[in-house]
Structure formats: C-alpha cells, structure tokens
C-alpha cells in the first residue's frame, strides 16, 4: 500500500465486481420525490399506524425473554406457524425445518435464493427492464447475467431473443 502524507495509508481499491454497481435507483428516486414533495410509490412507507392489538402485543413481548437473535433461518415457532399457514394455503405438505426460511426482507431472500442455485460462471437470464438487484445478485454469486429485453407496450419477450440467450 502507498503512504499518504502524515503517515496515512491509502486503502485498497474496491473489487472489480463492484465497478458495475451504482447507487440504488429506488433510493435515488426517493431523494428526488422528497425534494419535490411527491408521493413516494417506490418503497413501503405506510401512512397509518399499526393496529392497536399489534402494538399492545409488541409492548408485552418487549418485557418477556425474547430479546435475542433467532437462529439464522428463523425462530422455530414462527417457521412452524408459517409452514402450517402456507401448507393450507398452497395445498402442500411443508416441513418448517426443510421448506421454510425467514429473511430480513425480500433483498436478503432473493440473494439467498440466488446463492442457493448459482455457481460461479453459471448464466442467469435477467429480463430487462428489471428490479435493480437481479443483475447485481447474479454478479455477486459469480454468475453471468444475460439480459433479455422486454418489449413495450406490454413488455413481452421475443422468443428468439430468449432462445439466443441460452446459446
């Protein structure tokens, strides 16, 4: 590493894989919306309070012994409840220890899904336009995103373009 004046150390450049990433388009649009007082339709900003029953229960459990991180894939009782609900809703036999994982949000869920199925140098079809994380998730998994355009006005894909993407 090179030295700067007064003994400072120059930090290593960021990795090559990060060179194609930019700031979040969604967050950039949020800043613009806020600047002009526009209504932000891009993120979940509810303009109402949670139901009182939920607030009351949260207040109760804050004083109980549930103040530690759950296991990585989610608390057992929560996964059991999700498996029971989704089994009924989806008409499937779901095992809470094999078929259910709890994440901090959709971004983590999508990344976990991509990391579960992608190996380095795999090809991943990404329809374009796309949610900004799809291409980045592929790259971070070591896969190569292959962009296939969706055509307005109904944003259908062209069958030949999709077939060519697999070649």
Which residues make up each language-model segment?
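Short, Lys/Arg-enriched N-terminal segments with co-localized hydrophobic residues
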Residues: 1-10
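Extreme N-terminal starter segment of soluble prokaryotic enzymes
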Residues: 12-15
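N-terminal small-domain helix-loop-helix segment of the aminotransferase-like
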Residues: 7, 17-104, 112
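Conserved core of the PLP fold type I
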Residues: 66-167
